[in-house]
Amino acid sequence: NPDQKQKLIENPELMPNFLQECIRMVSPVIHMRRTTTCETELGGQLMGPGEKIVMWYGAANRDPSVFTNPDKFDIERENADKHLAFGIGRHTCVGKPVALMQLEESYKQILSRFPNIHMSGNWKVAPNNFVHAIQEMPVKF
């Protein structure tokens, strides 16, 4: 998304929202499983105690009832921070603030040192069914 990168370079105050949109689009964790502790209903489906529920972050973070045009990468998306990539409530990832700080500093350094960086081929995702990890990403400076 060269247009979005240029917008970020020209408007560094968009960095926090850019980070949220990146995480929304490609959640670090692919899914999380929980076990019901009592009879409960979710989305009209009745479940008994001890049943397994799997939340797929990619589906939740691209829910069209929450995100307009959910497959579009938009660093000015007003509700980009409404993603569930770090969980919610008491299950929120304790590492969330550190992860956001690391991402912010990484992107600041990359963009300030290599403003012309761009992908020069297809990226490969490391085979893993729990977390997204980039195995290979060819770039040019």
Label for each model-derived stretch:
Residues N1-F141:
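Cytochrome P450
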